[in-house]
């Protein structure tokens, strides 16, 4: 209902003083405007024009509210409300019977004003008439005794101080008991089930004020009638504490639905029960849902707790396991530490024993070499070889050398090339003198003392190895890098280089014997560790340079005690075959392979044709800006030991014929030489060659090239086998020496040539194609490393630069004392083209440049690999000589660098024969012999392993 502000409350009557509720009469006026009855069309007009005319009639008075109640073709009805009833009467007088004129209308409009009546004003008259007609016997319960209120403001009937706006039945009862005693009061808004049953239509909003419905039943009908009469045409007014009053129209009617009847009450109760049951079910369902949700929540919490607990247990178990493992490791480390302490003493004793065995092996080797020298001294045709045996003994047994002889040799080493060498008779006398001196008792005593000193030095060196290993490794790398970038000694002219032939660029003593053109230039390096006490005076001048060279040196694998232990305790003489021949053509891809086997007194030869493809790496030469690559494919010769029996026996005749031809050819070579290098006996071998890489002292000893003895007819294979057994050229090298990754660079054998004479062309050094037979590698310079798979590439170093570690060796001999083979002098000398045999049948070839024949002296560095070390060497350049007097015999040492994987199955006892394209040229190649024949020159290379601490490689070149 409409809530209005009351300005004049003079006509208000009190309803309930406690709630400040009053009843104010409704002052309404009904205004009817009659429309004219005419057929003629009139101008249309609006209701607002008529209302404006009415307001002008009552001016200055005003209506509180005016609204259009009804509009027809006959009249227009307006309902107006004023403040008081007296004012309504005044307005009625002003409006009743008045005429309104509208513009455009020919006729006038008449106004009729009357008082407004309630909707149920006729109700008491009907009831009174019925009573009069004799309806007194009718039950009053059947009559309307309940009042229905609509539009009561909730806030006005709510308890004071409450935040809610819900009405209270007690307040409603108190307010309306002023008319009589109330029997029942019902507010449907307060019943939640009723709100569900009726759809929530028990209240509403009246201009922002929430209202409600109520049913009131009086006990007495008279009270009911009194209340109805009092509430007819009234408004409910609330007077505030501040004096302001608000009036609200309420709707008051008698109850026509019999709301308080028993049937209605019973229906409402049943519905309430149903609603209660539904509500209970809803509550239970809600409770169940809550319980399920709670259970799920608890389960999740429990799972999370279990998960956290498992994680904690797992972490605890891991920590416990780690602690247990640490305790175990601690328990293990303690016995290991004690065991290491216990075994350290035993290892020191073992090192001392190994050092002593090494010295004893050297003694035994010297004794054997002396016996060979004595035998060769008896042979008349082996006088030239006696000199080399003596030199070998001097190098090997430098600790026993006569200081006078050492001084003599050192003085001879600095002679000019014009100085002639001693005659063969003088050399023989020197050799005998040396042998006689070695057989003296004083020599034995000094040998014993020196051996004991050497043992102590080896023992002390082995103890300091482990401490200096890490320092030495870093220092060696720095020194190698420094030495690799440091320019070498500049190339001197022939006259100046003659004066420098006696200089020492490596460890040990340097003995140089220089003669004229047909001279022998030799350099011998003695073992420094065994000779430095007895030769302190002779080596004093070279100590400073040796200290510089030895600085940063890394210990080699064959110097270690582990290698010596393997060599002395586990190494056994190889039992595999030793003879195998193979021939190949230089240009053809298909080759005839010839295998020669020793069988009894003869040979057995197999011939078979095979396809071959070589993979080679050529040397790079840089001489005067010209680069030339040459490749030579030499036949491969394998010689097997008589121990390996042949499976085929059908070609013995051819083997015997080949053997006879070889013997005759060796005899021809011996007959052409002046000094009969090889024995006249055909069964003997011309030269013995073993590439040696001996074990050095662990502190500062370097390997020294030394000469070896010739093999005689009487000594034969057993002596060579025995030497191989005690030598260091064994399978141990292939298995242990590959562990050494870094060694100082060395360049050896630099020979000068005179500018005014034409330099000799370097000879062809033949290398063999390797044929794997029963998984055996048969080339002496061929090794396999476990980790590397590339082949080394040899480069010629630019002239004028030389590494500090280069060694010069120039042995020059008189024409009468040299070995000479004059064949077809008119032909051009061959160029040096060494082919280094690679593993698995692959070649490593090198080529030389034609600029070697120019007047400028060229230096050449051939980098190759041995035991995976960086070692530099130079080709041999002999002084130029006339062809007729071209008899030169020189000793050189080639250190070959290998980067290819070396195989451990190194065949030490293989004998190899090589045949060149020329049918008259043969090469007897083995681990003990290496002979290369050419039209103008021949090569004889021989060497021998001379113990654990010595190494040598002798190379003879005949022109």
Curated annotation (Swiss-Prot):
Keywords: Coiled coil, mRNA processing, mRNA splicing, Nucleus, Phosphoprotein, RNA-binding, Spliceosome. Residues 538-547 have a biased composition (Polar residues). Signal peptide: none annotated. Residues 284-304, 332-342, 454-468 have a biased composition (Basic and acidic residues). Residues 305-331 have a biased composition (Basic residues). Ubiquitously expressed. GO terms for molecular function: RNA binding. Splice factor regulating alternative splice site selection for certain mRNA precursors. PANTHER family: A-KINASE ANCHOR PROTEIN 17B (PTHR12484:SF1), B-LYMPHOCYTE ANTIGEN-RELATED (PTHR12484). Monomer. Component of the spliceosome. This is A-kinase anchor protein 17B. The gene is Akap17b.
